[in-house]
UniProtKB/Swiss-Prot annotation:
<dbReference type="Pfam" id="PF08263">
    <property type="entry name" value="LRRNT_2"/>
</dbReference>
<feature type="repeat" description="LRR 3">
    <location>
        <begin position="162"/>
        <end position="185"/>
    </location>
</feature>
<feature type="repeat" description="LRR 28">
    <location>
        <begin position="831"/>
        <end position="854"/>
    </location>
</feature>
<feature type="glycosylation site" description="N-linked (GlcNAc...) asparagine">
    <location>
        <position position="866"/>
    </location>
</feature>
<feature type="repeat" description="LRR 8">
    <location>
        <begin position="284"/>
        <end position="306"/>
    </location>
</feature>
<keyword id="KW-0472">Membrane</keyword>
<feature type="repeat" description="LRR 2">
    <location>
        <begin position="137"/>
        <end position="160"/>
    </location>
</feature>
<feature type="compositionally biased region" description="Acidic residues">
    <location>
        <begin position="911"/>
        <end position="922"/>
    </location>
</feature>
<feature type="repeat" description="LRR 7">
    <location>
        <begin position="260"/>
        <end position="283"/>
    </location>
</feature>
<keyword id="KW-0675">Receptor</keyword>
<feature type="glycosylation site" description="N-linked (GlcNAc...) asparagine">
    <location>
        <position position="813"/>
    </location>
</feature>
<feature type="repeat" description="LRR 11">
    <location>
        <begin position="359"/>
        <end position="381"/>
    </location>
</feature>
<feature type="transmembrane region" description="Helical">
    <location>
        <begin position="929"/>
        <end position="949"/>
    </location>
</feature>
<keyword id="KW-0677">Repeat</keyword>
<dbReference type="InterPro" id="IPR051502">
    <property type="entry name" value="RLP_Defense_Trigger"/>
</dbReference>
<feature type="glycosylation site" description="N-linked (GlcNAc...) asparagine">
    <location>
        <position position="98"/>
    </location>
</feature>
<feature type="repeat" description="LRR 24">
    <location>
        <begin position="671"/>
        <end position="692"/>
    </location>
</feature>
Length: 976
């Protein structure tokens, strides 16, 4: 009997052991059903296009172990769910979360509902338990609600989760005062993250959260330093984040210096000013101190020498000036990251020192420190991962010893200095990022650069003076994704190894050099290449077959070379990824292929300055944002396709041979610049142009347009719309080269190197006539340029006074037309006008004296009209010379030499611009009436005199009749 009992006990223990070893086949059935109900609820809130991605491993299969489903973790003993994550769901709209769906998970310890961009929970509800719902989850310790659309309505629900120790609510953009008192029952809370939530006002009391060890209030709108006193009660606080708020004034030492347990203090991105508090040196437990991006000045306090635990110190982007000693860092044995820079050019960091560093840094970032020489302490570093010495006036040789002493160095940034000699180590190195752009380096690239630096991911050597050919060893850089050698003096043909070996290249920029020979003459292996910029070189011949192998090419710029051949044979027909194509100022010829403008993603096309001819294609891609088209300075003929007007954002067709009228088109609101200067367009200006409410630059000059100027042109927008700019833009399809490396991580702070280059950014340059010259506008000046040019046409009639409503207009040119009547006094509303040209017309009347109020007017030309009266004086009119008024003999006064003595001064002191305009028009009308009466009376008197002579018999009458008979006789003889 005892043996049977013993055997039975052994069997039970064996079964328990097997269960422990193998685990449960599935979670508890009750929780399985609850999970499926939760999934069903999530599906009901998800957009149709995201249904397949909703928890796909959560299946209604009894053989499936739900403890292995995504986002779950089970207790190995009980089989109950202890961790649940249901983020990454594509909701069709913001939705409430039904908390009752979570009640079956009785042992749940961690709940992650973070959106991470995708989720859009905006509230919580429970129709049965109400605000007490979360009290049912008695074991819940960690709750993550970050990156959603929650508001303050969730706080009463959270107050019931009394077991919480960690709560993340960041990135919900809640706004308003922080209702921390509504969390008074969370007495066990140790970590609270409220960052990036839009809170403002004062920082409230935290007296009921005495166990709090980590608090993050970063990226809110707190501004008062007084309320920081409320944080003093948190005596157990070890981590405090107040970065990116609006805190200003001196750093409150009575607050931070009393937090003796602080290990991490993040105050970056505020407006703190003054010197660093000496008492910060008493925080001997401090490991992380970030004071970057403030307005601090002074020097490092000597007390910092006592921060024995300090590992991370960032003082970058402040206002430090004068001599800056690094002596207080000498004994910081644990220091790993040191960052320092200044917005002031007066900072002079100590480079020569007698102390030997006791630390081994992984990050040494000292840009904008006016070093002059590399600091001595870097010589003793052997564990560096990142070194940034950019913008420091350093000269001489590139410091290759940094690579030799630090075999694990990943990032070396030396840009914007005065280095003259480029050297590399003799042994292979693991360097991944090398930036030596904007220096004074000459000579050639070392032949072995590809052998020594085979792991490079990013190399920028642009804006130097390199010469010679590119070394063939560069083809061994198999991992390189970004290579920029633009703005140098390289020459010769591109090495074949570069085109076949660097198969990881995403961006290749070789512009502004002297490279020659054909472009891409061979098949390449650059299948990952997205951006290829080769403009401003000496490339010749046709574009080679290698272009067809660039299957992912999106941006191709070969402008300003000597390329020949046909466009149709140069660009592959299957260039479906192409978004930017620039081949301007070459020798390309032939017609424009319709397939080119039909490429779906094409957003920027510049073929200007070539020998292209024929009709423009009518098939244009219907882009949501509009296509930017530059085809000026070619020989295109035929009509202007309506599809170009309907789908272009910028359309530049200047100096071609287009004919016909400007077609009627459907306004899509895309057009912002329309340049049709120098063609053979005829007909009237269509009123459809008035519907271009976003237009900024309109040039119809030097054509054969006739008719009147539509008054509705005052509907043209002269206000920069939201999101509309001309100086530069990135396409809606954006490709960039990114690189991210993490060098240090703490509770709320991550020190990482992030490199992102937006390869689609373009600086737009547009030519427009202003101030009597033809200028190119780009950059910031283009963003403020508004212009209307209708000059050199056959327009007639009056100048519409409504054009004065274009208050932001900077250039208006109506010269060389057939315009009559007077100059509208309403032009005085053109407050920003800089250039006003009305010359070579048939304008009459006076120059409105209200125009003297145009304080920005720099060029004013009304020459060769029929204007009369006294030239106004005052303001900018005192700066114009006689050339502005030539060909108007009835104008008098300064700056002409014609006296106005005896003429009535037409400047009257009246009350409004409209009344003045009526007065000017009346004066012009009176002049014409006098002219008509004078002419009529002259003819009447002459006729009466002839009749009188014919009524009396006198020698004069007989003589007159003889003359008439003679004319009649001669007429008969001529026609007989």
């Amino acid at each position: 009997m005892e043996r049977k009992v013993f055997s039975g006990q052994n069997l039970i223990w064996v079964m328990l052991l097997l269960v422990q070893l193998r685990g449960y086949k599935c979670c508890i059935e009750k929780e399985r059903k609850a999970l499926l109900e939760l999934k069903k609820y999530m599906i009901s809130k998800t957009a149709d296009w995201g249904l397949d991605s909703v928890l796909p491993t959560w299946t209604n299969d009894t053989k499936s172990n739900c403890c292995r489903w995504e986002g779950l973790k089970c207790n190995q003993t009980s089989g109950r769910i202890i961790e649940l994550s249901i983020g990454q769901t594509n909701f069709k709209e913001s939705s409430l979360l039904n908390l009752s769906l979570l009640h079956p998970f009785e042992e749940l310890r961690s709940l992650n509902l973070s959106g991470e961009i995708y989720n859009e929970f905006n509230g919580l509800f429970d129709d049965v338990e109400g605000y007490e719902s979360l009290r049912r989850l008695r074991n819940l310790e960690i709750l993550d609600l970050s990156s959603n659309s929650f508001n303050n309505s969730i706080f009463p629900f959270l107050n019931a989760a009394t077991s919480l120790t960690t709560l993340f609510i960041q990135s919900n953009y809640i706004g308003g005062p922080l209702p921390i008192k509504e969390l008074k029952n969370l007495t066990k809370l140790e970590l609270l993250d409220l960052s990036r939530s839009g809170y403002n006002g004062s920082i409230p009391e935290f007296t009921h959260l005495e166990k709090l060890k980590a608090l993050d209030l970063s990226a809110n709108d707190f501004s008062s330093l007084v309320e920081l006193q409320e944080l003093k009660v948190l005596t157990n606080l070890e981590v405090l984040g107040l970065a990116w708020n609006h805190l200003d004034g001196p750093i409150p030492k009575e607050v931070f210096c009393e937090m003796k347990n602080l290990r991490q203090l993040d105050l970056r991105g505020n407006y703190f000013e003054g010197q660093l508090p000496v008492c910060l040196g008493n925080l001997n437990k401090l490991r992380v101190l970030d004071l970057s991006s403030n307005q601090l000045s002074g020097n490092l306090p000597a007390s910092f020498n006592s921060l024995e635990s300090l590992e991370y110190l960032s003082l970058s982007d402040n206002n430090f000036e004068g001599f800056f000693s690094l002596n207080p860092l000498a004994n910081l044995t644990k220091l790993k990251v040191f960052r320092l820079s200044s917005t002031s050019e007066m900072l002079q960091v100590e480079t020569e020192s007698n102390w030997l560093p006791k630390f081994q840094l992984t990050v040494a970032a000292l840009p904008f420190c006016s070093l002059g020489k590399i600091p001595n302490f870097l010589v003793y570093q052997t564990n560096l991962r990142l070194v940034d010495l950019s913008s420091n006036r350093l000269s001489g040789d590139i410091p290759t010893w940094l690579l030799e002493n630090n075999p694990e160095l990943k990032v070396l940034q030396l840009k914007n200095n005065s280095f003259t000699i480029f050297q590399i180590p003799t042994i292979v190195h693991k360097l991944q990022v090398l930036d030596f752009s904007a220096n004074d380096i000459t000579g050639v690239l070392p032949d072995n650069i590809g052998h020594v630096l085979p792991r490079l991911l990013h190399m920028n050597g642009s804006h130097n003076g390199f010469q010679g050919n590119l070394p063939s060893s560069m083809g061994e850089m198999n991992d390189i994704s970004f290579l920029d050698l633009s703005y140098n003096n390289f020459s010769g043909e591109l090495p074949r190894s570069l085109l076949t070996g660097c198969f990881s290249l995403i961006t290749l920029q070789l512009s502004h050099n002297s490279f020659s020979g054909p472009i891409l003459p061979i098949q390449t292996r650059l299948t990952s290449l997205i951006v290829l910029r080769m403009h401003n070189n000496l490339f010749t011949g046709e574009i080679g077959v290698g272009l067809r192998t660039l299957v992912n090419l999106s941006i191709f710029d070969a402008s300003n070379n000597r390329l020949t051949g046909l466009i149709s044979s140069s660009i592959p027909p299957d260039s479906s990824h192409l978004i930017m194509l620039l081949l301007s100022n070459n020798l390309l010829e032939g017609t424009l292929p319709p397939s080119l403008l039909a490429i779906h993603h094409l957003n920027f096309l510049d073929l200007s300055g070539n020998l292209l001819s024929g009709d423009l294609p009518s098939s244009v891609v219907n882009s949501m944002y509009g296509i930017k088209i530059f085809l000026h300075n070619n020989s295109f003929t035929g009509p202007l396709p309506v599809t170009l007007l309907e789908n272009a954002y910028i359309l530049d067709l200047r100096n071609n041979k287009l004919s016909g009228s400007i077609p009627q088109f459907v306004n899509t609101g895309k057009m912002i610049t329309l340049l049709l200067r120098g063609n053979n367009l005829t007909g009237s200006i269509p009123r459809k142009l008035c519907d271009l409410t976003s237009i900024r630059l309109l040039d119809l000059s030097d054509n054969k347009l006739n008719g009147v100027i539509p008054p509705c042109l005052n509907h043209l927008s002269t206000e920069l719309g939201e999101g509309i700019g001309l100086s530069g833009f990135s396409q809606e399809i954006s490709f960039g080269d990114s690189l991210q490396m993490e060098f240090y991580r703490s509770t709320f702070l991550v020190d990482e190197f992030m490199l992102y280059y937006d390869s689609t950014y373009m600086i737009v340059e547009i030519e427009f006539a202003a101030k009597q010259r033809y200028d190119s506008f780009s950059g910031g000046t283009l963003d403020y340029m508004y212009g209307l040019d209708l000059s050199s046409n056959e327009l007639s009639g009056v100048i519409p006074a409504e054009l004065g409503d274009l208050s932001k207009l900077r250039a208006l040119n109506l010269s060389r037309n057939l315009l009559s009547s007077s100059i509208p006094a309403n032009f005085s509303k053109l407050k920003d006008i800089e250039s006003l040209d009305l010359s070579y017309n048939m304008l009459q009347g006076n120059i409105p004296h209200q125009l003297t109020n145009l304080t920005s007017l720099a060029v004013f030309n009304v020459s060769f009209n029929n204007l009369s009266g006294i030239i106004p004086q005052g303001g900018q009119f005192n700066t114009f010379n006689d050339n502005s008024y030539l060909g108007n003999p009835l104008l008098c006064g300064t700056p002409t030499d014609r006296s106005c003595e005896g003429k009535k001064n037409t400047k009257e002191a009246d009350n409004g611009g409209e009344e003045e305009e009526e007065d000017d028009d009346d004066e012009a009308a009176i002049d014409m009436v006098v002219l008509y009466w004078t002419t009529g009376s002259t003819y009447a008197i002459a006729l009466i005199g002839i009749l009188v002579l014919m009524c009396f018999d006198c020698p004069w009458r007989r003589t007159w009749l003889c003359i008439v008979d003679a004319f009649i006789a001669s007429g008969k003889s001529m026609f007989s």
